């Protein structure tokens, strides 16, 4: 079956955009084909710095014929209705329509519309220019003389040529006939910018790949990654070193080269006095190079005075000039970093605190200096809850942001916290304080490590709670996909800190403590909404671990639930209980009772929330259920008070036999009004008894 080959050849595409652009190209073209009824066997898109390419295999040469029956108005309908029908169906007169008789609706007109299938190449000639013109680049540009004309093409970088061929492997493919802003689709592409810049004629994908390889272009980004990683490891191994692997850098570098050639450079050993993270950040950020690790006798990471760079060409001198040029730049950058390091060490963190008053955190939330004071006060209050020393927690929080005004963090913001730890250690701060300065930002994401040191936990919680409470107090909350202040991440960080450390943290109390640092704002205006936000984040966190979101809703629906650790334990106990036969049957009994109550309360316009009257019990099953409810409620309440949620579930499980017997033997809607009301009150007592652990009405399934 025929294949499509499409290549869009341009100036250099930013590395960060390439993978998404390739996926967008594949999806846009294949979706457009499927919408028109053209199926295919497979599709794969590719990206290099200078081209996007798409191969779609197994397309038909022609679309299927379409036969459609379109129902029209009744025979004898008004002329306007008939004319509208003829126009929409593309008929010239009623003679072209068929009359169909229906026993119920009478006779009506039907138009039989037959459309022959279109040639695939003609459909592609419509789809491809539309996709190219409307391509969703994050940033795009116009260029040349055509850029002044309305509707001219926008592309990420100037587009030079288009390859678009279609046809079976056994025949010569045809050119897909279209042009965009004077660029005619054809069979000509170009090789590597320096190694093989001449034109290359390609007509099918099977020829396209080897032709590019001969022209020093590796089309597949994953293969470029593999080449870089394999060669870098080999170079390091040959020197007795280990490559410090970096997935993000590897992805970026693979998007910077079409013909990757790995080389090794070095720098003066004196620069190894700088913290290894600084060396890595310097070489990574400025030169897109990988650092190397030297063998260590003490188990601590020690960098080597060497680095791996990736060139986009195989130079005639073996890369000597390229290496020398990179070494000069790395030496200059590391000299700057060493200057920052030596300069920063001369100024104690404590002395830097006044400068934080000049950094605005948010126009409505004050400066970083004011924020530090709030975080320090909150950390001292939270310290007893996590087993931390209040003095150490307050001191760590006070110094936690001081490195923001250092030279090093000014140059490399991603090193905030880490540099604070280094400077704190050098200045003789206790280890717990130095560690907390680094770790108070953690966890930064779902896979990031959670701090376990008590002082670190106290400061990390204080930092995140201050952020959340502050933004809720000024009513700047995440909306849809927008979360510019990473508040979802902060809430998830609080959840992970609490659960990982078994921290008993009543959130409403923490909100009140956190908001105390904000003038003229009380927690009552936002506490419920912020608690709901935590509930949503907890659902996401537990759902990723396999928990049911409806059980979280059921527990949060009980008033006063703001202890995340106890909520999770209650959810876990509820889930285990509902997996048992007793749990499933009790849930079924609850639903039956709730449904009866809902119907009868709506019909009667009243709630049956009075206590059942034992004097009105006429059947033993009523007395048995009432007694069982009294006993189960007492045992469940006692178990919940002792935080024994499994025990509370066991207490509720004892209700199953009397509930089953009640529904088997008792007619709830008795003719006697008093008897009926009392039995409905008994069902309400069952409904309320389950609320000792959760709102069973929120449970799905």
Curated annotation (Swiss-Prot):
The GO annotation for biological process reads: arginyl-tRNA aminoacylation; glycyl-tRNA aminoacylation
Q: In its keyword annotation, does this UniProt entry include Transmembrane?
A: no
**In the Enzyme Commission scheme, what number(s) does this protein have?**
6.1.1.14
* Places the protein is found: Cytoplasm
Q: Which GO terms describe its molecular function?
A: arginine-tRNA ligase activity; ATP binding; glycine-tRNA ligase activity
Keywords from UniProt, A to Z, are:
Aminoacyl-tRNA synthetase, ATP-binding, Cytoplasm, Ligase, Nucleotide-binding, Protein biosynthesis
Which interval of the chain is the signal sequence? Answer: none
Q: Catalysed reaction per UniProt?
A: tRNA(Gly) + glycine + ATP = glycyl-tRNA(Gly) + AMP + diphosphate
Family of this protein:
Belongs to the class-II aminoacyl-tRNA synthetase family.
Q: What is this protein called?
A: Glycine--tRNA ligase beta subunit
The organism named in the record is Methylobacterium nodulans (strain LMG 21967 / CNCM I-2342 / ORS 2060)
């Amino acid at each position: 079956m025929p294949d499509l080959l499409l290549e869009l050849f341009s100036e250099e595409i930013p590395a960060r955009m390439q993978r998404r652009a390739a996926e967008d190209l594949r999806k846009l073209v294949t979706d457009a084909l499927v919408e028109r009824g053209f199926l295919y066997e497979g599709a794969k898109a590719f990206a290099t710095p200078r081209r996007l390419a798409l191969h779609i295999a197994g397309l038909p040469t022609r679309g299927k014929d379409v036969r459609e029956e379109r129902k029209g108005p009744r025979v004898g309908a008004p002329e306007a209705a008939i004319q509208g029908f003829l126009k929409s169906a593309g008929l010239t007169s009623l003679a072209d329509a068929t009359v169909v008789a229906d026993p119920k609706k009478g006779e009506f007109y039907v138009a039989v519309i037959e459309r022959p299938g279109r040639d695939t190449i003609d459909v592609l000639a419509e789809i491809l220019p539309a996709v190219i013109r409307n391509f969703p680049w994050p940033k795009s540009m116009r260029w040349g003389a055509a850029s002044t004309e309305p509707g001219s093409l926008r592309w990420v970088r100037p587009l030079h040529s288009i390859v678009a061929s279609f046809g079976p492997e056994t025949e010569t493919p045809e050119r897909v006939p279209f042009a965009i802003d004077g660029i005619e689709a054809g069979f000509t592409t170009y090789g590597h910018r320096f190694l093989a810049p001449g034109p290359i004629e390609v007509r099918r994908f099977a020829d396209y790949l080897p032709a590019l390889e001969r022209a020093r272009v590796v089309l597949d980004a994953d293969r470029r990654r593999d080449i870089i990683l394999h060669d870098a490891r080999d170079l390091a191994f040959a020197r007795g070193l280990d490559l410090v692997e970096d997935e993000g850098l590897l992805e970026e570098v693979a998007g910077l080269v079409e013909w990757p050639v790995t080389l090794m450079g070095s720098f003066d050993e004196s620069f190894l006095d700088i913290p290894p993270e600084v060396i890595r950040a310097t070489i990574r950020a400025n030169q897109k190079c990988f650092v190397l690790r030297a063998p260590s006798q003490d188990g601590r990471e020690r960098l080597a005075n060497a680095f791996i760079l990736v060139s986009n060409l195989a130079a005639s001198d073996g890369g000597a000039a390229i290496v020398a040029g990179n070494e000069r730049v790395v030496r200059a950058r590391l000299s700057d970093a060493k200057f920052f390091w030596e300069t920063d060490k001369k100024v104690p963190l404590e002395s830097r605190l006044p400068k934080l008053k000049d950094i605005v955190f948010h126009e409505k939330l004050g400066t970083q200096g004011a924020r530090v004071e709030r975080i320090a006060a909150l950390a001292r209050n939270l310290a007893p809850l996590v087993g931390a020393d209040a003095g150490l927690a307050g001191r760590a929080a006070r110094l936690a942001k001081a490195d923001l005004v250092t030279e090093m963090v000014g140059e490399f913001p991603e090193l905030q916290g880490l540099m604070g730890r280094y400077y704190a250690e050098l200045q003789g701060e206790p280890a717990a304080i130095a560690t907390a300065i680094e770790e108070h930002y953690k966890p930064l994401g779902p896979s990031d490590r959670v701090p376990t040191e008590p002082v670190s936990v106290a400061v990390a919680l204080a930092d995140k709670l201050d952020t959340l409470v502050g933004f809720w107090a000024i009513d700047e909350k995440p909306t849809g996909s927008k979360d510019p202040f990473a508040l979802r991440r902060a809430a998830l960080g609080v959840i992970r800190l609490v659960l990982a450390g078994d921290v008993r943290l009543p959130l409403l109390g923490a909100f009140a403590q956190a908001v105390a640092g904000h003038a003229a704002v009380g927690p009552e205006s936002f506490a419920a909404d912020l608690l709901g936000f935590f509930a949503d984040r907890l659902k996401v966190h537990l759902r990723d671990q396999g928990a049911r979101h409806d059980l979280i809703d059921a527990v949060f629906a009980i008033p006063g639930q703001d202890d995340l650790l106890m909520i999770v334990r209650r959810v876990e106990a509820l889930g285990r209980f509902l997996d048992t036969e007793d749990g499933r049957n009790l849930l079924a009994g609850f639903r039956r009772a709730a449904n009866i109550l809902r119907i009868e309360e709506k019909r009667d316009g009243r709630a049956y929330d009075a206590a059942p009257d034992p004097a009105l019990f006429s059947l033993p099953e009523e007395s048995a259920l009432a007694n069982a409810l009294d006993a189960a409620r007492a045992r469940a309440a006692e178990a919940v008070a002792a935080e024994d949620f499994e025990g509370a579930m066991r207490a509720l499980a004892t209700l199953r036999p009397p509930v089953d017997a009640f529904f088997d033997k008792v007619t709830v809607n008795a003719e006697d009004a008093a008897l009926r009301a009392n039995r409905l009150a008994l069902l309400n007592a069952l409904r309320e008894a389950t609320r000792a652990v959760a709102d069973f009405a929120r449970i799905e399934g």
